[in-house]
Design a protein with these regions (language model features):
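Short peripheral tails and domain-boundary helices/loops at the edges of structured domains
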Residues: 15-25, 218-242, 330-348
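Catalytic cores of histone-lysine modification enzymes
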Residues: 168-291, 295, 305
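Acidic/histidine-enriched ion/cofactor-binding microenvironments in catalytic or ligand-binding pockets
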Residues: 194-195, 296-316
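Short coil-to-beta-strand transition motifs
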Residues: 4-16
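Cys/His-rich Zn2+-coordinating "finger/knuckle" modules used by eukaryotic regulatory proteins
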Residues: 96-175, 328-348
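Intrinsically disordered, low-complexity acidic/polar tracts
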Residues: 37-39, 45-140
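Short solvent-exposed strand/turn elements
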Residues: 21-46
Length: 348
């Protein structure tokens, strides 16, 4: 869970003690004081990154190596800039930015039955949305998801509660200032200028909604295809956000002849640039607010741990090795370069 003090603590590397001495501290008591030297070859100091970000905001400094001020073209709550500090590649603009899912002509939402709450919903009220969520609100008072669920039911347009209801979180768009940046060996990635606490909402995975039959005709786009109900976190846990070893299982009601997929190859948002990791810091969560149809959940990405500024955001693509095929039915293979200590070596 998030820290009650709202302070963000981050791991900052390994240090060797090179000297120790006993002296009087500021309060007049004797204390041991240590001289530390940081071991070489580790990532940049978290403190220096925080100071860099603070200077950008405080002094209004221009973002170094900026390629594009806002790839969303004003469609998000924050500008999503593009930065390349690695090579001479231009900004990736070969797609149409859409902040919401692009539905096909045949699709129509069946509005859910909304709650009758006035003002905001709470666990203590006789709220139908609270009942859908197992008798508790999925978010705390600061808008952080409390625990992973099979499905989170947010209040929507059918509900009488206000737009400021604490059960309306992911539908409001970006909460953090994200930027697209060029990685050294994995193409483009995404990071946040702001610190993120566990349970913080990052973004929705948007794109074109396709039937699985249509998606199979776009096998060349496999790294942009997100199968609804298959990659999301569908098994709830009892330990809150202890999600590092989270398993994924299909909801039985989704096991139908017709499945659906989101394709972000030609249309998508900042989520299309978020890379895979075998040890991710984000997880995918099914969310419903404009329908109760489990076949068409919104795929929302949330933080599963404290994430300091400028650290790459990642989630587990959840591919099964040997199950990704090309147009001819041959098994495809791709190496994984996530760099995690428990990296599986192959993305698929």
């Amino acid at each position: 869970p998030a820290s009650p003090s709202s302070r963000l603590y981050t791991y900052d590397g390994l240090y060797d003690v090179v000297n120790v001495h006993f002296d009087n501290g500021a309060a007049g008591f004797g204390v041991y004081q240590f001289t530390l030297i940081r071991r070489p070859g580790q990532p940049q100091l978290g403190l220096s990154i925080v100071q860099f970000v603070g200077n950008l905001k405080k002094k209004g400094l221009a973002r170094p190596n900026l390629l594009l001020e806002d790839i969303s073209q004003g469609q998000e709550n924050w500008p999503v800039c593009v930065v390349n500090e690695v090579d001479g590649d231009p900004a990736p603009t070969n797609f149409t930015y859409i902040p919401n899912i692009k539905y096909p002509k045949w699709f129509s939402h069946v509005l859910p039955q909304g709650c009758d709450c006035e003002g905001g919903c709470s666990d203590e009220t006789n709220c139908s949305c609270v009942s859908k969520n197992g008798g508790e609100l999925p978010y705390n008072e600061k808008g952080y998801i409390i625990r992973d669920k099979k499905v989170v039911y947010e209040c929507g347009s059918s509900c009488r509660c206000s737009s400021n209801c604490s059960n309306r979180v992911s539908q409001k768009g970006l909460r953090y200032q994200l930027e697209v940046f060029k990685t050294k060996n994995r193409g483009w990635g995404v990071r946040s200028v702001n610190p993120i606490q566990p349970g913080g909402f990052i973004c929705e995975y948007t794109g074109e909604l396709l039937s699985d039959a249509e998606a199979e005709q776009r096998v060349e786009n496999d790294e942009y295809l997100f199968e609804l109900g298959n990659n999301c976190n569908l098994e709830s846990t009892d330990g809150g956000l202890q999600l590092k070893n989270m398993s994924t299982t299909m909801i039985s009601s989704m096991n139908e002849d017709i499945g659906y997929t989101i394709d972000a190859k030609c249309m998508g948002n900042v989520a299309r640039f978020i890379n895979h990791s075998c040890s991710p810091n984000l997880f995918a969560q099914n969310v419903l607010y404009d329908s109760d149809d489990l076949r068409f959940p919104h795929v929302m990405l949330f933080a599963m741990e404290n994430i300091p500024p400028m650290r790459e955001l990642t989630y587990d693509y959840n591919y099964t090795v040997g199950q990704v095929l090309d147009a001819s039915g041959n098994i495809k293979s791709k190496a994984c370069y996530c760099g995690a200590s428990d990296c599986k070596g192959r993305l698929y």
